[in-house]
Amino acid sequence: MHEDLLSPKLQLLQTGFPERLVKLPQNAQVAWREAGDASSDFAVVLLHGISSGAASWLDVALQLGDKARVLAWDAPGYGVSTPLAPAAPADADYAQALAQSLLVLGVRRCLLVGHSLGALMAARLAVTVAPGLVEQLVFISPAGGYGAAAKAEQQAKVREGRLAALAEKGVAGLAAVIDQRLVSSEAPEAVRAWVRWNTARMQPQGYAQAVELLCGSDLAQAQGRLGMPVQVWVGEHDVVTPPAACKAWSELLGAHYGTLAAAGHASPVEQPVEVAHRLASLLNQSYLPNTS
């Protein structure tokens, strides 16, 4: 049954949001998926969360591809992307790989979207690594990280718990139940199957590195340092990064706050049409290339 649900999705993935590999220094590569005009120097750039991958943005990309160039990466250590060199990489390491990739892809300006853990990478790019690239920033259900000194005890528990679960269950075991926390109770089985498929493609090493990123980063460091318009959106049924927490982040960062109806944490998978509609509205605010 799950194969029947996934087959049309996988076909769409190949035809509508194909993968391309970007070569980086030290024989590294980063896998990207792309829709829209590949010659544009402006793109909507989509960063996935800790238990996901580039393909999770498929339906959002299909909605946006006729309006803008759309790019989504498998972060280092995910899919066929090379893991980062440090065993415990920082958000700056991911942001550097992101900036290098976008340079190779010819992107000079972007609307940057970070979902969950992707928000920490996006924030680092926008604050210090390449702020000139980012015209607008969207955090969807942002992970705040556990890098603040006051969160040291919580950091240790999160690291131990996530790495123990990986060791005990493996990627397949994590994927088998991941949808139970990432989508709302009303999510159809096709959505759940797609969430599980994306998680099942994780590399153990890449996931372990991402746990270190989560534990070592602090989204609050971006306070007062984001020189572009910022949005924070969250699914109304999100139990991972609940609406109250996301609203607090929006207030701290001076961002516009909005909720996504009938969605849990994985709102780009559960409600892709609404997510794409909101992103398209931002594109209409003069963020597209000048064609005159």
Please tell me what each predicted stretch does.
Residues 123-128, 132-167:
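Flexible "cap/lid" loop of the alpha/beta hydrolase fold
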Residues 93-110:
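Conserved acidic catalytic loop of the alpha/beta-hydrolase fold
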Residues 227-263, 269:
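Conserved loop-alpha-helix segment in the C-terminal half of the alpha/beta-hydrolase fold
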Residues 1-44, 65-68, 107-108, 280-292:
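Alpha/beta-hydrolase fold catalytic core
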Residues 150-156, 167-224:
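Conserved alpha/beta-hydrolase catalytic His-Asp/Glu region
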Residues 254-292:
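Catalytic active-site module of serine/aspartate enzymes centered on a nucleophile-bearing elbow/loop
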Residues 28-83:
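Conserved HGGG/HGGXW glycine-rich cap/lid loop of the alpha/beta-hydrolase fold
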Residues 114, 118-122:
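Gly/Ala-rich beta-loop-alpha elbow adjacent to hydrolase catalytic centers
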